[in-house]
């Protein structure tokens, strides 16, 4: 059975990816499960540049290690707020300076939107997936979902900006959604549904 190696050290992101891809006839592994200790510097100027770089570095490492029957999947995701000209964007995970500090990032976002009216608080979550096959073929998929940023945290599910991102069709924030609800409509869910079509053809 082929292995799909997730080029991420973010445990919550890995959990989501595994949940959405769990019905595929493929073994899904994290970097930790494959004993890969690589931190890829995300210095690209777009989500795609970062996702591709992560996937490519792990791909090259696995080729050099002599691995067979594998695919590498990387995800670069973030929040783009209209009023803030697309911020935090590619800096979503480190918006407040420290990587992965959800509380500080949310605090900074709310501060930057202080006094901004609801109609100007539109935002979208973006997920860019980049995948390399064992033979070096490259695939990319993008998923997006629109909503708006509320004025205080609501819900303790998900991670990142989920408790601030209000999704009108369900009348809830992403932080209030059950994992299966979120995965069915989120930016990552949308992108992975498209990627599944590709995977079913090549595995």
Where are these regions (language model features)?
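Anionic-ligand binding patches
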Residues: 2-5, 11-203
């Amino acid at each position: 059975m082929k292995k799909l190696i997730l080029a991420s050290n973010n445990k919550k992101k890995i959990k989501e990816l595994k949940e959405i891809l769990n019905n595929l006839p493929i073994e899904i592994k994290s970097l930790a499960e494959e004993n890969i200790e690589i931190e890829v510097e995300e210095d690209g100027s777009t989500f795609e540049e970062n996702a591709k770089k992560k996937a490519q570095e792990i791909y090259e490492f696995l080729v050099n290690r002599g691995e067979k029957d594998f695919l590498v999947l990387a995800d670069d995701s973030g929040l783009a707020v209209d009023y803030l000209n697309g911020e935090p964007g590619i800096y979503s995970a480190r918006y407040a300076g420290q990587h992965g500090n959800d509380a500080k990032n949310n605090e900074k976002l709310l501060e930057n939107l202080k006094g901004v009216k609801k109609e100007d608080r539109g935002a979208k979550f973006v997920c860019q997936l980049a995948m390399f096959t064992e033979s070096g073929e490259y695939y990319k998929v993008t998923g997006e979902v629109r909503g708006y940023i509320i004025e205080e945290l609501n819900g303790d599910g998900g991670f990142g900006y989920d408790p601030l991102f209000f999704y009108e069709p369900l009348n809830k924030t992403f932080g209030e959604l059950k994992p299966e609800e979120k995965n069915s409509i989120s930016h990552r869910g949308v992108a992975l549904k498209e990627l599944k079509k590709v995977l079913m053809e090549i595995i």
